[in-house]
């Protein structure tokens, strides 16, 4: 298939010999690739260095998603100004990367008591059991789920949120790219790769771990301090309220 396309050049954001050989067999003459056989690299740093070398200019790792302004404004008009609006990222690529749903429910209840809020549950159809737990809880009437929405339909909603709180998942990175302040819980994935590339992301790590030691196979979900998550959430919401006040 690649050979039929008659590509002139390929950029391979990977150190795999397999991709190099596939490109050669496809007849692609110009092959730009990471150094072969490189292991344990930081995927963000490696991509940045590679891209800068290819383009000959400095590039930012700060992703930015642009949305239709009218759609964002329409959603904003539906948001109550008396509430804080929080995107809650309960989903993840696997159970070891998810904080307990009971913790999230407890967190929502405590936040809402201190700062009246509405929660937007960033999860999909595969997270139905987790979503059901939330909608069986005391906080259910303050929640809206994304499970029946397409990702592009959720973005104007997220864009109007005051804060993202949740696991290291796709919703985190979408929220960050929409310039939303994010509180990300890292328990079984590399902080230095996924939590340091954006000014919008603040992290909570398992007790006893550091940014260097929190990586794949850390298995630290049970060591995420509830009080730290709660206190940091309140702090970020209060800071946001203060900044909005002085800006107005």
Where do the protein language model's features map onto the residues?
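Catalytic machinery of carbohydrate-active enzymes
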Residues: 1-248
